[in-house]
Amino acid sequence: MSCTASYAGMTTPVKDKEGHGIPCLQPIDVVECTYQYFTKSRNKLSLRVGDLIYVLTKGSNGWWDGVLIRHSANNNNNSLILDRGWFPPSFTRSILNELHGVPDIGNELEIFQAGLNLKLELSSNPVILSLEDFLDCCRDIEFKEQLAWSPTPVHERKGCCELLYYNQDLDVYCRTLPYLPQNQVETVNDYSSFPAISKIAGKKMPITSSPDLFYLNDCDVVYWYDLTRLVCHYVNLTERDLLANEREKFLTSLDLLTAQITCVYMLFRNLRLVEDSFKKTLKKLIYTLSRFSINANIWFHSTPFEEREAIASQKDPERRSPLLQSILGTFQKFHFLLRLLHFLSNPNELTILPQLTPRFFKDSFNTISWNNPFLRKHLNQHMSHDLPRQMIKAVAGASGIVAENNDEIPASKQGTSCSSETSHHSPSAPFQRRRRGTIFSNVPGSSDESDTIWSKRKKPYPLNEETLSLVRARKEQLDAKLKQMIKSANEYLSNTANFSKMLNFEMNFKTYEEVSGTIPIIDILENLDLTIYLNLRELGDENRVFDEDVAIDDEDKEFLKHSLSSLSYILSDYFNMKQYFHDVVVKFIIVAQHLTLEDPFVFSPMQNDLPTGYYEPMKPSSLNLDNAKDKKNGSQNTDIQEEEDEYEPDPDSLILFHNLINQDSDFNDLKFFNLAHVFKKSCDDYFDVLKLSIEFVNRLILERENLLNYAARMMKNNITELLLRGEEGYGSYDGGETAEKSDTNAVYADSDTKDNDEWRDSQVKLPRYLQREYDSELIWGSNNRIKGGSKHALISYLTDNEKKDLFFNITFLITFRSIFTTTEFLSYLISQYNLDPPEDLCFEEYNEWVTKKLIPVKCRVVEIMTTFFKQYWFPGYDEPDLATLNLDYFAQVAIKENITGSVELLKEVNQKFKHGNMQEATAPMKTLDQQICQEHYWGTLYSTTESILAVDPVLFATQLTILEHEIYCEITIFDCLQKIWKNKYTKSYGASPGLNEFISFANKLTNFISYSIVKEADKSKRAKLLSHFIFIAEYCRKFNNFSSMTAIISALYSSSIYRLEKTWQAVIPQTRDLLQSLDKLMDPKKNFINYRSELKSLHSAPCVPFFGVYLSDLTFTDSGNPDYLVLEHGLKGVHDEKKYINFNKRSRLVDILQEIIYFKKTHYDFTKDRTVIECISNSLENIPHIEKQYQLSLIIEPKPRKKVVPNSNSNNKSQEKSRDDQTDEGKTSTKKDRFSKFQLHKTKKKAPKVSK
């Protein structure tokens, strides 16, 4: 059966743009006739070899229903005849399934990529080619599969119907059915049937293809689809400008199109796509681009504008000039070549393309000239360059070096020896040979001359007053020269005629001299030690997983998070200031150079006419013709615009400017101004930025002190240790000199230390068999104390038969666990008990050795063991291996030998190990008095403002002192050691109950005071509470209760209280001055020097010290000093291989512990009020933390505009104030006002004059 195309009822009607119906077949399969089949039946199709049949249905009887399209031989208008009928499928073969088949390449990712079918919508107009153009484009292109063409009838304007053949893969129409010869060997399932895969698979992609290597923009080209779409967009844009008769826009679009084609060429070279199909297609693409570029220029130059306008406006293509038709035909071929290139690359649709546009490497953007220490942690500290870590790894991989982790990637300076003797980070020999071929040997940053200031300076500048003084001193030296330069500029402005050129050169020379003098300031800014802020960021990370030995609770995490948010904007401003410092210096140099030029605009032609980012790719949302001006016109108009200059124009320059305009001269929008004004303004900016640098260094120093001050006042020594970890000079302690201590406070007085020199001299006179064997392995300090020694030497000195060093013995027994395990320590003592006699002794010498050394040493061993078990034993010292020592048997042997104290030793051993009594000799007492009723009396609480104000400040301070001193007395030396050692030496220490309770009480008191104030809605009552607590703190000071006093001060300077402007206004100045004096006493400057002086003057008075200072001293002494000493021989200049115990570190710990114990001995003679004490204890429970209190503070006084500072000289005010004290808008505007005038090439725009 047959029918005309217009009456084909089995097709789905589709209308074109002009409303004409286009019958479109929807076959379920396409088959090719392989054998001839003739039939006379009208419901069956006769087939010839090569016919394409479009299958509509597949019958169950073995016959298929299909459509065969042929030209009508009897009709002059070449109408189409559609034959539909049944045909036998055995005479055909399906080609649709082969087209969509997926080759088995053994890789799941490649299978997914090969089966991906993205439909490109590259052009709004269809691409229609003649057979000649199609064959010309596809000549020498090997298609591994035959292309499937769908015949599509299309109505023409004259009412005729034209048949076009459409290929969906190439998205192209052809006027004649193309036929391309197929290869003889079928390679559908062969790996090489996909040229892109065959060339790339198995090879390493270029290093620029790594998705984690660069900071990418949203508009960057990443995939093949994006690239093809972007290029086609510029083709469409160029074609539209051609038809619009806009020559300037056409040239701009053509320039952008040429840049994108260049990117395509570079991309194919980077991917090493050397397949002939790619090379030939790309060559044809470039040739076609050159062809229509030449023809288009001929079109614009040879044809008048009006004629071009008339020709381009013709809707009938036949009425256009042949040249224009040829150009448009070339555009059609260009579109098809792009589709063909995309079709050949289609199997790699998800492959990430190499980065072609310049982008910053990740972890490397440190502004222009400055290092960013917040990114340096990712770099190897031993590297001689600051190359990005990802870049180093990528280049190493491209050089044949495989590193499983970043630590295996070495980097050494050019020409530096890599032998194992000089560096323990040297690579292996095979790696050295490979590395010679990498790019690192030619990296400029790897040379000694181009190293940064950071790499040249070994130690950073600490954040302290000394560093600030260096900056200020350098600035004062620069100010004198700068003022003279400003004076010269003013003289030029007042007397331009007599201003010589020589003076210009002199000012230029002084500018360079001034800038060179700025290097020390740049050195300080570049090398400030920001370790504490780096640690704060790490600790404030919510995703951070802490080690087991790091104890950080929820309250500590809340404090860290709050501190990080409060300090982040200060650090951001600091780095902005560094960048503006760079901008001002650069501008200062440029302006000074202008002074020596006859024509200050002589370098203007060197400026690029194109704006920044002119050739940047466009965003996907902009790739349509409606938004085409975003790239072509918008970028040129908006990006080139610069702000007006704020300098006053020179009158003579204005006259010249207007004359040039009147003469129609090209002035290129240049601004004529007086250079002296510019130079003077640059000097002013330079002067201001120097002051600004001092201000920011001072702010960083204050914020560091405030952060440590708050952590110390809250007794968060673990936080302090983590914040200062890695900081230069952290915890340093000069072991050579012992801190001066009051004789009254010295608990363990050693009256014999002054005679140590004479005693050591007497040892030399003894016979050799009576001398100490390990005396040469002891290191003595200048204070006649043991500074260090080997384990054998320390044990020998501990059990010495002639010398009893009481302080050494106590220090050893308290801190022995940091040197030995319990089993090891007792084993050494047992070995010392069973001393072997020296060799070659006669009978008399042996008897003398037994009498004068062996027996006294045995007595000393038994005495030391007894003292250890009786006074210094701690349940955490127990170990499973202790049973192997048979201590009870050892004691019984000592009893049989009649050793003094052996009976008591056996008693202590049995008590500690056999009877299971593992209680500590100094067991802690209960927190409260035993007579206090254990039943909680909840009726009386300080829960209201009236109840708190009703209590007399003296009574409250007295009972608070009694309560806190009782808790302080429960602190043991083992609590302190547990706090600083944690699990460092043993995991059986557990918690520190006494110390934890004392710290918890102080922090609860702080929260109670601050919460009592913020929950009160009435301003006058809040002011009374402030005054009331200040008076309580003052009485606590009079009672030497520094712990409670510090807790109250910390509460009043907390973020939720400090910001209450209206409340502080209601407090009288005398009371605020009283608070200021209390805060000055606890000033953390110089390691709490004011508080330490006050504490030292107390002598025998009762006191509750502020424990935060002790915790800091213990933490810094333990963490900041090594456990071992390494001696260096002066003659050889090499280190001794033996390790000596740093006993001086242990002595310093005991010095601090003895001061803690001292204040437990003197008690207060106050009368205890049980009701008040119980009310205080119960009121401290269930108090909200800092965040909840701050929310209440915002409710009672929202958004204060300015702050009334209760203590203007307090150093902890900026840490305690909240991050919301300054609104975000305020911060932003402040930063803009401060730094806007330092922007290079841009100044503030003057307000335009509005004419009425």
UniProtKB/Swiss-Prot annotation:
Any one Gene Ontology molecular-function term assigned to this protein's record: guanyl-nucleotide exchange factor activity
Domain Ras-GEF as annotated: residue spans: 952-1199
Stretches assigned to the N-terminal Ras-GEF domain: 782-914
Name the UniProt record assigns to this protein: Guanine nucleotide exchange factor SDC25
Comp. bias regions, Basic residues: 1239-1252
Misc remark: Suppresses the CDC25-5 mutation in yeast (restores cAMP level) and has similar functions as CDC25.
Keywords: Cell cycle, Cell division, Guanine-nucleotide releasing factor, SH3 domain
Compositional bias (Low complexity): 416-428
Ranges of compositional bias, category Basic and acidic residues: 1214-1236
Gene that encodes the chain: SDC25
Lineage: superkingdom: Eukaryota
PROSITE patterns for the chain: RASGEF, RASGEF_CAT, RASGEF_NTER, SH3
UniProt GO BP: cell division; Ras protein signal transduction
Function description: Promotes the exchange of Ras-bound GDP by GTP.
